[in-house]
């Protein structure tokens, strides 16, 4: 019987496996095993579904032990600004420090989450990339007044993203605005220099 931990949708089928303990056997999967180790994995775009999953895990892990760090691994192309801010607020709300680690890429909304980790506990692997840019929105239609409302909301989101990134990188909001006017792609070392992360992790594998 499955343990009920929902895995992200993917064409790659993750294996389940059987664990034995003093309480018997149980079927589990890699995501459930990571959760037991207080690790959350964001491996999809940032949307309402993934945001709700991540927020629920953050709150549960806080309840289990409010004094132990939580680690958020990120490999995401980004996504919804409102979903991003929901995760961001929860990361700042919970008592445990949230470590962030980029594997592969942290683009757009995911880059903000990477930067929002606890100070000194944000990292990236050597060949990962980080991309920051201004928030995007779907094409709008309607009367002039509707378009004005949408334009004001886009500008509000942009200012919020700029001040959020500025807070966590040490850059000014004005510099963030200049840098995100177009896509800004950073290597691991450049993300470190920019202040999005605090360290570039080396490989665990021993070099021969």
From Swiss-Prot:
GO annotation, biological process: protein quality control for misfolded or incompletely synthesized proteins
Reaction(s) catalysed by this chain's protein: Hydrolysis of proteins to small peptides in the presence of ATP and magnesium. alpha-casein is the usual test substrate. In the absence of ATP, only oligopeptides shorter than five residues are hydrolyzed (such as succinyl-Leu-Tyr-|-NHMec, and Leu-Tyr-Leu-|-Tyr-Trp, in which cleavage of the -Tyr-|-Leu- and -Tyr-|-Trp bonds also occurs)
Keyword Cytoplasm: yes
EC number in record: 3.4.21.92
Compartments it resides in: Cytoplasm
GO cellular component terms given for this protein: cytoplasm; endopeptidase Clp complex
GO molecular function: ATP-dependent peptidase activity; ATPase binding; serine-type endopeptidase activity
PROSITE patterns: CLP_PROTEASE_HIS, CLP_PROTEASE_SER
Keyword flag Cytoplasm: yes
CDD domains, per database record: S14_ClpP_2
Broad class of enzyme this protein falls into: hydrolase
Function: Cleaves peptides in various proteins in a process that requires ATP hydrolysis. Has a chymotrypsin-like activity. Plays a major role in the degradation of misfolded proteins.
Similarity-based family: Belongs to the peptidase S14 family.
Subunit structure: Fourteen ClpP subunits assemble into 2 heptameric rings which stack back to back to give a disk-like structure with a central cavity, resembling the structure of eukaryotic proteasomes.
Name of the protein in question: ATP-dependent Clp protease proteolytic subunit 1
Gene: clpP1
